Amino acid sequence: MSAAPPNGNKIRLATVWLDGCSGCHMSLLDTDERMIAVAQRADVVWGPLVDAKEFPENVDVTLVEGAVSSEDDLERIRRVRNRTRILVSLGDCAITGNVPAMRNKYGVDAVLRRAYLENATLDPKIPLDVIPALLPVSRPVHEVVPVDVFVPGCPPSADLIFSVIGELLEGRIPNPAAKFG
């Protein structure tokens, strides 16, 4: 499996943000001017700030930040996996569930009650009309869909992210056994 398209064109790169803090995307931005070299060989076709309504077809590489915690996350990651050749779990939330999974031992109802009813608020109600339907537990990405590459860290360093992207641009898959460093 290679990230490089067979026709020699630029790779189609996407990033996805599920249930996480955006720290992994901040580390990606911390690659600074090195992203210019990436931009010469990859087109960013999707990301949290891209003004597109639907995740595109035929994506070569997708970096996924965050755990799968809601029905929306589950639907999104399945669609992304179906449209992506190489899926990268970026950061500890995507790899282990990390902070989003801390709620798992309490259950959805207890977490929503604590967050919206028991804390000081002017309007104590659970805003079910605006929050996505939570899954019973928050799960790492690989428990829901197959993952090809794991990039650990909370967040992973900019150097590690750039190294992984560099390997993918060269048509090499970083060793998935390096999941935990």
Regions flagged by a language model, labelled:
Residues 2-181:
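Iron-sulfur-associated redox domains of electron-transfer enzymes in respiratory
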